[in-house]
Amino acid sequence: MVRVMATGVFDIIHLGHIHYLRESKKLGDELVVVVARDSTARKNGKVPIFDENSRLKLVSELKPVDRAILGHEDDMMKTVVEVMPDIITLGYDQKFDEADLKRKLDQIGVNSRIVRISKYDGNLNSSSMVRKKIMELIGERF
């Protein structure tokens, strides 16, 4: 069985998220999705609208997802060791240096393949674009 791990904040679910998860699922038999903790999202400059437990519930209900878990606050590698994925997928816009990630995986003895998932070709394919569109629509009404 090939286990795939996808990660993200997953705030305001949109078609870009669905594309990322569908493409990730195609790579294996089981898709485990790691939802970022609120504190982790904030450390990376994101302020989630939905709290971590709500985002976890939303993600767990998506069709491609076999299992959704919350990530560790202090060390992503702890989550990797718990999941032991054969493949780790990264979204097109996730700020991971793939070579650095591979080095960290090697250091902890995890031999996961890293796959960067392509960008979804469509409108509103990122949370920031959705937020921007909402603000534009609100601005038009006032």
Curated annotation (Swiss-Prot):
| Cofactor dependence | a divalent metal cation
Task: State the family named in the UniProt similarity comment for this chain.
Answer: Belongs to the archaeal FAD synthase family.
Q: Which PANTHER family match?
A: FAD SYNTHASE
- What residues bind ATP, as annotated? V9, F10, H14, L15, G16, H17, D93, Y120
A Gene Ontology annotation in the biological process aspect, one of them, is:
FAD biosynthetic process
Please report the name of this protein according to its UniProt entry.
Answer: FAD synthase
Transmembrane feature ranges = none
Q: Which reaction does it catalyse?
A: FMN + ATP + H(+) = FAD + diphosphate
Subunit and interaction comment: Homodimer.
Q: Which GO terms describe its molecular function?
A: ATP binding; FMN adenylyltransferase activity
| Annotated pathway | Cofactor biosynthesis; FAD biosynthesis; FAD from FMN: step 1/1
Which SUPFAM superfamilies is this protein grouped with?
Nucleotidylyl transferase
Corresponding gene? ribL
What are the UniProt keywords, alphabetically? ATP-binding, FAD, Flavoprotein, FMN, Nucleotide-binding, Nucleotidyltransferase, Transferase
Query: What job does the chain carry out?
Result: Catalyzes the transfer of the AMP portion of ATP to flavin mononucleotide (FMN) to produce flavin adenine dinucleotide (FAD) coenzyme.
Q: Which domain of life is it from?
A: Archaea
Enzyme Commission number(s) from the entry: 2.7.7.2
Q: Which InterPro entries match?
A: Archaeal_FAD_synthase, Cyt_trans-like, FAD_synth_RibL, Rossmann-like_a/b/a_fold
